[in-house]
């Protein structure tokens, strides 16, 4: 469908140049319009098929402007430690916990994919942070 996708090329500090396909299914935090030169964090499904080409090309799942915030996308155990053991949430999000459509989320994070927005974290393992905002994706 012509016009329904956006091809985006970014220069990553870790991976060099990377191409992303942005579709109507891509969640863009705060529905922000992206511009050339924006500092972004892009999450993609590492288990999804991808062509073996250079530069690598992935389908973007979540995109966030990241000039002032850091982001983590993943699942959490009931002790608020991420399932990969890299991040621990201390306390509730300052701005709240929401669904992608902006409605308040009142359930438990366990077993759900969550996008955590934060400004600082400790250098411990796992890193600890008090999130600014949490967006919970309830997949069926």
Each model region followed by its residue ranges:
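Short, basic/aromatic beta-hairpin or loop at an interaction surface
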Residues: 9-22, 84-95
């Amino acid at each position: 469908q012509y016009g329904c996708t956006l091809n985006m090329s970014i220069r990553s500090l870790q991976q060099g140049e990377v191409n992303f396909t942005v579709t109507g299914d891509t969640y863009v935090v705060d529905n922000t319009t992206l511009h050339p030169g924006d500092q972004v964090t892009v999450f993609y499904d590492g288990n999804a098929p991808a062509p073996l080409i250079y530069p690598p090309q992935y389908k973007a799942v979540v995109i966030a402007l990241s000039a002032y915030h850091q982001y983590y996308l993943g699942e959490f155990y009931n002790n608020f430690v991420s399932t990969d053991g890299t991040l621990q949430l201390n306390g509730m999000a300052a701005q709240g916990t929401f669904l992608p459509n902006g409605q308040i989320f009142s359930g438990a994070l366990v077993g759900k994919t969550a996008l955590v927005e934060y400004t600082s974290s400790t250098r411990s393992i796992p890193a600890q942070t008090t999130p600014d905002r949490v967006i919970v994706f309830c997949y069926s």
